[in-house]
Regions:
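Short hydrophobic alpha-helical membrane-embedded segments
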Residues: 85-90, 203-211, 350-351
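Hydrophobic transmembrane alpha-helices of multi-pass small-molecule transporters
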Residues: 1-27, 31-40, 185-264, 397
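Membrane-core helix-loop-helix motifs of multi-pass transport proteins
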Residues: 117-206, 335-397
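Hydrophobic core segments of alpha-helical transmembrane domains in multi-pass membrane transport
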Residues: 5-18, 47-55, 139-143, 147-151, ...
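Transmembrane helix-loop junctions in multi-pass membrane proteins
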Residues: 17-27, 58-62, 144-160, 215-226, ...
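Membrane-embedded alpha-helical segments and adjacent helix-loop junctions characteristic
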Residues: 23-119, 246-331
Length: 397
């Protein structure tokens, strides 16, 4: 990450000097640094809400119960983590939130999972294999319901706003599989034997799989309607579960929510570093300088130039990629229902802002040496792009 942090601004400086855009670069650098603080503080309310709800679920035993049901799978993915460790339940909550397209909820759950994983870290400041794998799964971002894309398509008058659901699911399943495989191959060293501990029978995992398949079918069929119900239902369900388990839900909620501000402040230095580097590359024109000729090459194998631009922008900037998506869909030559419109929505919905996720998740626990996490994230992003193109070719074209 040290080399990445140097090379991005250095490339931006060279390109800006060549094109005469130094004034723009200077302004963008300061704007990116200033923007990190409101971005972090903007997370405070959402973090407080979902960390509070998570504390209620934790005290009620929901996280432990969920981890036990999924233990046959979790123990193979994360053999370094003890079977009954609270990190297991926190990771499940994070993946579930991503699955439903609840990015705002997934971040607090993911940070809590990272904190639990850090408690097992023998070398503080260096990411463990479990932390790298968990982050890689997050950058792949398995998603059933890409809510923001569906909302944008609906607002632009799409005849079928939920058309992106099926290709997005396929692309995220592929990118997640590649993320897991790349993390395993790049971690080095010997494999850790699967721990033995309290585990649910395999029928519990099978029942969960069937339930997930039913949920996928429901979201594909009625995703646009169901999407508005998810967050209110989640709040009521978790608080209701706490009452049923005789948890003092107000005290538990406040205890968890109190951590929201501290976490947001803790990630500011990491956000500044990433956002400044990314902002300089975008403002200098270095990104376009690389991607425009690359797009002409990828078009020869069926990958549109705008898809390459979207994939690269998505890895670097959430707001930038969403702005690009909206701009392209408003273009009369593309529109939301064309092949390119659906493809761009699928790429956005099936990937994550890799650099931002690394900054937030690792920054929250003070990880400075990220090992192979960035490589895994970018490999997963590339796999997701290829899968999105193929899925849209088969299902849409």
């Amino acid at each position: 990450v040290n080399w990445v942090l140097f090379l991005l601004p250095a490339a931006a400086l060279v390109v800006a000097a060549w094109t005469g855009g130094m004034e723009t670069l200077s302004t963008a650098t300061l704007a990116a640094a200033e923007g990190a603080v409101p971005l972090a503080l903007g997370l405070v309310g959402v973090m407080a809400l979902f960390l509070g709800l998570m504390k209620v679920a934790e005290k009620g035993g929901l996280l432990d119960a969920t981890a036990r049901v999924l233990s046959p799978l979790l123990l193979r993915l994360f053999p370094e983590v003890p079977p009954d460790h609270p990190a297991m339940g926190a990771m499940v909550m994070n993946v579930a939130a991503n699955l439903l397209g609840l990015g705002n909820a997934a971040t607090p759950f993911g940070i809590r999972a990272m904190e639990h994983l850090e408690s097992l870290n023998p070398v503080k400041g260096t990411a463990t294999n479990a932390q790298v794998l968990f982050l890689a799964i997050n950058t792949a971002s398995v998603t059933i319901l890409p809510t923001s894309v569906i909302a944008l398509r609906s607002g632009l008058g799409s005849a079928n706003p939920a058309a992106v659901v099926a290709p997005t699911l396929i692309a995220t399943l592929v990118s997640t599989g590649v993320a897991i495989l790349s993390a395993r191959l790049l971690q080095g060293g010997r494999s850790v034997p699967v721990a033995v501990g309290t585990s649910a029978p395999l029928w519990g995992l099978a029942a969960t799989g069937l339930g997930l398949a039913g949920l996928i079918a429901a979201l594909v069929a009625w995703g646009q309607t169901i999407g508005h119900w998810i967050i209110p239902s989640l709040v009521v369900a978790l608080l209701g579960f706490g009452l049923w388990r005789r948890v003092a839900i107000y005290e538990a909620f406040v205890e968890g929510a109190r951590e929201g501000f501290a976490v947001a402040v803790r990630i500011i230095p990491y956000l500044v570093a990433i956002l400044v580097a990314v902002g300089m590359v975008r403002a200098s024109g270095a990104l376009a300088l690389v991607l425009e000729p690359l797009g002409r090459v990828t078009q020869l194998v069926g990958v549109p130039a705008e898809a390459v631009m979207m994939a690269a922008m998505r890895s670097l900037s959430g707001s930038g990629s969403f702005g690009l998506l909206a701009e392209q869909m408003k273009n009369a030559a593309i529109g939301p229902d064309s092949f390119s419109g659906v493809l761009l929505g699928t790429i956005y919905g099936s990937s994550e802002t890799t650099f931002y996720v690394i900054a937030v998740y690792f920054g929250a626990v003070g990880i400075r040496r990220i090992r192979h996490a960035l490589a895994c994230g970018l490999i997963a992003d590339a796999a997701g792009l290829v899968a999105a193109v193929i899925a849209c070719r088969v299902l849409i074209a």
